[in-house]
Amino acid sequence: MILVFDVGNTNIVLGVYEQKDLIYHWRISTDKSRTVDEYAVIIKNLFDLNGLDMSRIKAVVMSSVVPPVMPTLESLARKYFDVEPLVIGPGVKTGMPIVYDNPREVGADRIVNAVAAYHKYGGPLVIVDFGTATTFCAISKRGEYLGGAIAPGVGISTEALFQRASKLPRIEIVKPKSIIAKNTVAGMQSGIYYGYTGQVDRIVTLMKQELGRDTRVIATGGLAELIQEDSQEIETVDPFLTLEGLLLIYERNSNQQP
């Protein structure tokens, strides 16, 4: 079995693969202050709750946009799984050319998503990832990573309204009953929901003009399904795209089966 880590600014998503099947997945908070042992306790509890034996893990793969937490997680793999983790970054074989001014600037999560999406759907395509930031990645018909756009995430924008406007409350991010709201909470929900849906569609429309009409649009991340409800551009929501990309990259760097 193989254990994969998608380390984001807010959450770490973990997945366990047996062969090519994702048999378990979990989401825990990203905490730079946690020790190796504290992360190990959390993961062991998750394994125990699902009847999994940690000794069956034969490989660990990680992608991260949070460099400070990586020494801890890499030590976790060595100490508790007795393996050297494969960390996505320069020197790791992805099979995807990166056509970018400085390829090292591209977040590991964006490359992992691109690898998985091109493998599953072909190109050209646009990948929208709803995380702490909302990212838009363009992939050519030949499977080249072309670049994209980065916008503040839905959660960041919502929190900014609460923090910077003294009379505005924290809100749940949901689809409002009507775009014309009758109270403050509904008004904020309307602005956030339809504002982000419009933002996504506009950016994707412009990308498709450059990539071509046959461009497919794939979304992933926490709010992908919600935004897809009113999006005119998102075709498919693929919630485990990043985890699948981690498995693919592992396979391209190893002859062993997970």
From Swiss-Prot:
Stored SUPFAM superfamilies: Actin-like ATPase domain
Residues given in the record as ATP binding sites: D6, V7, G8, N9, T10, N11, I12, V13, T132
Gene3D superfamilies: 3.30.420.40
Catalytic activity field: (R)-pantothenate + ATP = (R)-4'-phosphopantothenate + ADP + H(+)
Enzyme class: transferase
HAMAP family linked to this entry: Pantothen_kinase_3
Name assigned to this protein: Type III pantothenate kinase
Keyword Cytoplasm applies: yes
Binding site for K(+): D129
GO-annotated biological processes: coenzyme A biosynthetic process
CDD domains given in the database record: ASKHA_NBD_PanK-III
Organism: Desulfitobacterium hafniense (strain Y51)
